[in-house]
Amino acid sequence: MNEQNGVLRPINGRAVLGLDVDGVIADYAGGLRPYAASDFGVIADGLPEPDIYSIVDAWPFSDYAHYRRVHRAAVEAGLYRSLPLIPGAAEAIRELSTAGVHVRIVTHRLFIGGQHARVVSDTVAWLEKHRIPYMSL
């Protein structure tokens, strides 16, 4: 890689964008909200938009293990196939790709064991549904 005009570029001249999914192009909190609300016994609109990074602290999970249980159930129910798209995200990524940027999806979605095949296939389905170009996941 070399630097040209402040942009790191691989030898072949294409810029590489490491693109996270949740909270960047997909609304993870919006997608998890109905699952968490059901678990808490509240209406989904009763859960505020998280104003801190840790959703475990933003919503009334008893602890991290509680969050993991809700998250696991949501993933098994298809969370990653149905997350809301952040407005304008798909268009922006398509524009970057058209300009020659190599889009590489980087994500921490694989943090719970036993769900890897589901997480990867649902992530790919979501990216394709929204026509978000990428070269690797």
PLM regions and their residue ranges:
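A general structural motif
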Residues: 12-14, 100, 134
